[in-house]
Amino acid sequence: MFLSTFEKQLDSKRRIVVPQEFRAAVSGPFDGIFCFPSIEADCLEAGGKALFDRYQAVIEEMPFGDPTRTALETSILGGMAKLTFDTAGRITLPDHLCDMFGLTDSVAVVGMGERFQIWSREAFQAHRAQQRDLAREGLAALRAQQRAAKFAGGAA
């Protein structure tokens, strides 16, 4: 499981040290990660074989030729890079993926359970603030629904 947020440096060869905890989470026959442009945000998404298998299963449930399936195949499978760890625990991000999201020197590696994201530090700071606001609003709405359900159940 990928947890926490780490600030890392991207070197001149576009290498980044993947946190040890993240490397341990993807250990297996393939010593590396799958990385692709996120379809949810302006960042890279990455994970191990389990994440790849999950996306593949979602895609394969859709009929061949379905526009959504094609969009997912193009965005995820077509944009995916299979990156192996070097002896220092680094991966080398492809130029086109770095250029897509302005990844230059300082990046945030953000754990999200079964996956993680790689952001430019500045973009992540803005995104994190937006996500905190959405989380507060969502939690308040959920609590209101729970109170309403409890009240409705008690009134019967």
Curated annotation (Swiss-Prot):
Biological process annotations from GO: negative regulation of DNA-templated transcription initiation
HAMAP family: MraZ
InterPro entries hit by this protein: MraZ (IPR003444), MraZ_C (IPR035644), MraZ_dom (IPR020603), MraZ_N (IPR035642), MraZ_sf (IPR038619), SpoVT-AbrB_dom (IPR007159), SpoVT-AbrB_sf (IPR037914)
Short name of one Pfam family: MraZ
Superkingdom of origin organism: Bacteria
UniProt keyword DNA damage, yes or no: no
The protein's name in its UniProt record: Transcriptional regulator MraZ
Similarity-based family: Belongs to the MraZ family.
Lineage: Bacteria, Pseudomonadati, Pseudomonadota, Alphaproteobacteria, Caulobacterales
Organism: Caulobacter vibrioides (strain NA1000 / CB15N)
GO cellular component: cytoplasm; nucleoid
Localisation: Cytoplasm, Nucleoid
Annotated keywords: Cytoplasm, DNA-binding, Repeat, Transcription, Transcription regulation
